[in-house]
């Protein structure tokens, strides 16, 4: 079947529900909501015990991604000792939004481009792309050393899109067209002939599980 990479956006967090403000508690410390905890177990069952057990697992070190991975393993009836390998990597962290309201920067983002605009005191998607590219190179070396064809990455919505952009060599315009995946969404990169309705493809690879943006969402 060849290499299969599944990326999961963390499940619903307390910031997604509006109960927690990242500026007050620290973005890295935001936990999953009770609904998100249950959803993570459902995601694990959807991925399947066989896939997860045979995978190299990578996760952002943020609390909500750690808890999502824990839920996935619980849903499969597995522990970290049961998988091919497990790693936390700070390069998979959420894009740093800085310390000013995102909404107040919307016009600047439109003017300078969604991909290029750097949040005040934070990062741009282009910055996230650079570190995600570095992660991908490290990951592929580990895949070769471990002699495995399955990878599971638990991360954040923008990091998912940057990873897909780098892996498929998408243009900036194609990146800008991608909607942020839903919480708990499973995105698959694999041989395009094995995927149902891939949204983007190249000569060999395709991606499924992503959708296109509508307006300025």
Feature names for model-found ranges:
Residues 2-80, 123-127, 132:
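Active-site-proximal alpha-helix that buttresses catalytic centers in soluble enzyme cores
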Residues 1-4, 49, 78, 88, ...:
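Acidic, low-complexity terminal tails and accessory targeting/binding regions
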Residues 5-7, 19-21, 38-41, 45-50, ...:
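Domain-wide signal for the mature, well-folded portions of proteins, strongly enriched
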Residues 13, 159-160:
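Short active-site segment of divalent metal-dependent hydrolases/proteases
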Residues 53-61, 87, 150-154:
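Short glycine-rich phosphate-binding loop at a beta-alpha junction
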Residues 71, 162-166:
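Active-site signature of alpha/beta-hydrolase-fold catalytic machinery across serine-
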Residues 14-15, 30-31, 73-134, 200-201:
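Phosphate-handling substructures
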Residues 128-145, 149-157:
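GST-like fold's C-terminal all-alpha helical module
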């Amino acid at each position: 079947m060849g290499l299969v990479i599944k990326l999961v956006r963390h499940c619903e967090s307390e910031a997604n529900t509006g109960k927690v403000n990242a500026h007050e508690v620290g973005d890295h410390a935001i936990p999953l909501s009770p609904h998100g905890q249950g959803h993570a177990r459902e995601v694990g069952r959807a991925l399947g015990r066989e896939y997860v057990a045979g995978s190299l697992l990578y996760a952002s070190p943020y609390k909500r991604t750690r808890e999502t991975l824990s839920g996935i393993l619980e849903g499969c009836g597995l522990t970290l000792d049961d998988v091919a390998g497990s790693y936390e990597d700070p390069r998979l962290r959420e894009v740093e939004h800085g310390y000013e309201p995102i909404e107040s920067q919307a016009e600047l983002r439109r003017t300078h481009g969604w991909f290029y605009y750097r949040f005040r005191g934070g990062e741009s998607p282009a910055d996230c792309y650079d570190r995600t590219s570095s992660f991908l190179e490290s990951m592929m070396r580990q895949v070769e050393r471990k002699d495995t064809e399955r990878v599971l990455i638990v991360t954040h919505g923008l990091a998912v899109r940057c990873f897909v952009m780098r892996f498929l060599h998408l243009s900036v315009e194609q990146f800008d067209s991608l909607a942020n995946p839903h919480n708990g969404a499973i995105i698959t990169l694999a041989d395009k002939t094995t995927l149902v309705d891939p949204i983007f493809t190249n000569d060999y690879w395709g991606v499924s599980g992503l959708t296109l943006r509508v307006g300025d969402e």
